[in-house]
Regions:
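Long, contiguous all-alpha helical interaction modules
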Residues: 1-157, 161, 167, 314, ...
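Basic, glycine-/proline-tolerant helical and adjacent loop/strand elements
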Residues: 121-295
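Domain-exit/linker segments immediately C-terminal to small folded modules
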Residues: 214-389
Length: 549
């Protein structure tokens, strides 16, 4: 049975405003995972446990704030007013740090705020010429995030990139408005605050009170819905939402435009759906500390994902690897059931929730993701492959559409894309068969396409690999002509669908002698005659032609 707030060996007194009894000593309050309404609340419960443990290492902390009981189902917190204030002082700790701006800062009335000072630096313009540029120095509030900093352990002398990513997210997404930054700002400016004590009073007197639920604490919340309904929560549940940002890993989705340039598009926030609180608390620090701090652009390389949902797969893989090392290969239930991935991005002064995706934690899916992530180099190829993992689709699914809609410079003419197609169709995705086993449709298509390209290379240009030898000029000519033939066929296939594609495949790609064997011919013919298989063969054909490009 779930407990509510209760006094622990405490005298009581009444508040001036009403008949609420206020304990003078600590209260004990318990939460169980099963009663909490969302993954954010459950993550908040885990964050509470880790923050209280971290607070116990601070000798300056005052009052009582301790975990009285912690098990798989939940925890009990014993805390008094001073202890709660110390806890809030920890999670909202901040400092004033000098930051340089390339333009003067303006207040809400569009008035220029005088800087502390200005400095000049030599910078290069687009033409490479140096010129002097003025920078304006202001004191800025920076969230400390000491718990996150404790998990971020780069090599000596290098920046804590994961901490910076967390700070940027807090400031640009969760606390993008000045009014929402007050808990941090007041502490950075060393002003007295009573937010912890006030929260404790609410939990001590009326833990089940209804309260508003702003988006500062709950991702996806709105002031009013389209039906003019407001988001509401229970006080004892909303309290937990102060802590989930400490245990929600952050990722940065990257997109590639039609010119091949990469651009970061907001944040992918991974909120864990916890089913074993004690297991989570035991392993979480290890999961966080094992992330690499190698920089890519201005963020950790391990934080970059090709699609927002990939963030959930990456966390699932990391969690399962930690559990696997600790428990061995035995079938151990993970302490995560799944994750909710929130894709958030700034749009002017607003924060947009672009998508929410649920990703279940399954070993086979996590392993398939890790294999794909490691094997492929092209961001476009990798994005489609990982999207198929997320959607539980065959590895080749969607590549026909991708090749048809993406500029050829990023597919058949891109070295990395062609390399990935070759690796996929010869190593990573291919089922290993013996000579006695029938070849799969993927193997038959790859063999037919390669035979066509090499056959046309010989009949049209008189080039054979056996004649190339060690002559570098002949080898280069051979590769150039082979790529030319593959690209021409690629462009012809991508513009054809349905019966038009089938006609091209049989009349052109099969115009050279093929050695597929009777069973292979029958399997390929069945596929081309089945309208449900034609798109599969078309996708595989485009991939096979790229592999030979």
């Amino acid at each position: 049975m779930t407990e509510t707030a209760k006094p622990t060996k405490a005298k009581s007194k009444r508040t001036k405003s009403a008949s609420k009894v206020v304990p003078e000593g600590p209260i004990t309050i318990r939460w169980d995972l099963a009663e909490l309404p969302s993954s954010q609340h459950k993550a908040g419960l885990a964050g509470l446990a880790l923050c209280v443990r971290f607070l116990s290492r601070n000798p300056a902390a005052q009052g009582i704030c301790e975990i009285e009981a912690l098990d798989a189902e939940g925890l009990a917190l014993r805390v008094d007013s001073d202890g709660m204030q110390s806890l809030f002082d920890e999670i909202y700790a901040a400092s004033l740090e000098e930051q340089q701006r390339d333009a003067p800062f303006k207040d809400k009335n569009k008035q220029v705020v005088p800087p502390k000072r200005t400095i000049e630096k030599l910078v290069k313009d687009k033409k490479g010429k140096e010129k002097a540029k003025t920078y304006y120095v202001y004191d800025s509030v920076v969230p400390r995030g000491d718990l996150v900093a404790d998990w971020d352990q780069p090599p000596a002398g290098e920046a804590k990139l994961w901490l910076k990513l967390w700070r940027d997210f807090i400031w640009s997404v969760l606390r993008s408005m000045a009014t929402t930054r007050e808990p941090f700002t007041s502490r950075a400016e060393k002003r007295a605050t009573q937010d912890g004590a006030e929260t404790w009073l609410g939990l001590a007197t009326n833990p089940s009170a209804g309260v508003e639920l702003p988006s500062t604490y709950y991702l996806g919340a709105q002031a009013k819905t389209a039906e003019m309904a407001s988001f509401r929560d229970v006080s004892r549940y909303q309290f937990l939402l102060h802590f989930w940002p400490y245990v929600a890993p952050l990722y940065v989705p990257a997109t590639v435009d039609r010119e091949g340039k990469r651009e970061f598009t907001g944040y992918a926030v991974v909120v864990p759906e916890i089913v074993d609180l004690a297991g989570f608390v035991e392993d979480w620090a290890t999961v966080m500390r094992e992330r690499a701090s190698t920089v890519a652009g201005y963020v950790p390389r391990d934080a970059i994902v090709d699609i927002a949902g990939e963030a959930g797969l990456d966390l699932a893989h990391r969690v399962l690897e930690v559990i696997r090392r600790r428990e061995g290969q035995q079938a151990t239930r993970p302490w995560l059931d799944g994750v909710d991935v929130f894709h958030l991005a700034k749009d002017g002064n607003n924060v947009r929730l672009r998508a929410v995706q649920r990703v279940d934690v399954r070993r086979e899916r996590a392993d398939e993701y890790a294999r794909s992530k490691a094997a492929y180099w092209s961001a476009i190829f990798r994005r489609q492959r990982i999207s198929n993992v997320l959607d539980s689709k065959p590895w080749w699914s969607g590549f026909g559409r991708l090749c048809a809609q993406t500029p050829k410079e990023l597919t058949v003419q891109d070295t990395k894309f062609c390399r990935d197609c070759r690796v996929a169709m010869t190593e990573v995705e291919m089922k290993v068969t013996t000579e006695s086993e029938p070849k799969t449709l993927e193997q038959l298509v790859y063999q037919a396409v390669r035979t066509y390209v090499l056959g046309r290379l010989g009949s049209k240009y008189g080039l054979k690999w056996a004649d190339v030898g060690t002559n570098p000029a002949l080898k280069q000519d051979y590769e150039d002509k082979k790529s030319k033939l593959a690209r021409e066929a690629f462009l012809a296939v991508r513009s054809r669908t349905g019966d038009d594609f089938v006609s091209y495949f049989t009349a052109t790609l099969c115009s050279v002698p093929q050695r597929l064997g009777e069973q292979g011919y029958l399997e390929l013919a069945r596929g081309l005659a089945d309208e449900n298989e034609v798109e599969r063969i078309r996708s595989l054909t485009l991939l096979a032609l790229s592999a030979n490009g």
